[in-house]
Amino acid sequence: MAAILKSHIKTNSIRIGFVPLVDCAPLILAKEEGFFEAEGLNVDLVREPGWATIRDKIVYGELEAAHALAGLCFGISLGLNVLARHCLTGFLFNANGAAITISNELIKLGVTDNQSLRNFIFSNKNKRQVTFGIPNIVSSHHFLLRQWIQPAGINPEEDVNIIVVPPQLMVSCLESGLIDGYCVGEPFNSLAVSKGAGSVVKESADLSPMHPEKALIVTKDFSDSRREEHLAIIYALIKAAKICDTEDGRSRLSTILSKPQYLGVDEVIIRKSLFTGSDGMKCDDFNVFSRFGVNAPSNSRANKVISQIRNAGLVKNLKDISINSVFREDIYLEALELSKKKQSENESSEILSMI
């Protein structure tokens, strides 16, 4: 099998959107290594400034698929701040990969964790409210920020101001004093540290280990009408994600992702989130692309996202949506089976060539 049902796949271009973050790595690698092309797919990668653009372009058919927030599948399907359309995912890009960064001004004022932040907020009542940036209301970053501040007795609705800021603008907003901190994915935590604008106070792998982060989202219409292509995309991403979790793969990714058409950030900064240690993020599993079965959109991962959406008060009634219709592990498993079959065929070919 030279490719997954290659002769039957349509030749229509497939536009896949992405936001320039380190966790889009499997998508970029699949394109750069020719994995999509090998499966007969004509994929165009479209760089977008933020999640609102990704959301709208998926809803209105300007993108066929996207690297997106895991929570956005439910957000679009529920019609949160957008026209409701049934979206789904058959592949999760990664787990973990985010952090909370605060301004060095707050650090100088003695804020180093959530408890010292609380002390500062309640001694600062007559001054301006502390403002945090998040990429989207249904992003893991919103939920992680709430999870960090609430145990310290900080009310996210009353004691701080939480606003939506596109990921690429987080650092400049921190530098200018428009926000006092943020929760976001890489490279925008490491970039703030390198610029002397802020310090990382919490990594998401510490706060909520193995939380689902990004997903490949498509509409149900796309998945139904172009199923073979959808499976082939996921197959290529599974293959790429495995490479992203190897040391050699991460070294290559640092260079590839730094290209201007992708992240456009110095590869030294990108390496800080791909290789943990004294010069980068501290958690060993800061970014997980394939290990521990993180690519499967399982019921347990779906329930985690839904629970976070509910706990944040974003929806009251979830009766109109089934988690099994949004997080489609069955589609992932079908693509995974094709991946295993392809690997077995390749191994058989290698053995025959040696005879």
Segments predicted by a language model, with ranges:
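Short glycine- and hydrophobic/aromatic-rich loop-to-beta-strand nucleating segment
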Residues: I100-T101, A215-V218, F222-S223
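Short gly/pro-enriched beta-turn/loop segments at secondary-structure junctions
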Residues: M210-E213, R252
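Active-site glycine-rich loop that binds ribose-phosphate moieties when present
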Residues: I163-Q168, E186
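Inter-helical turn/loop segments and adjacent helix faces that build the functional surface
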Residues: N155-V160, D224-E229
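Short, glycine-/small- and polar/acidic-enriched structural segments
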Residues: A2-E157, D180-P187, A197-S204, P209-M210, ...
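Secondary-structure end/capping motifs
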Residues: R227-V326
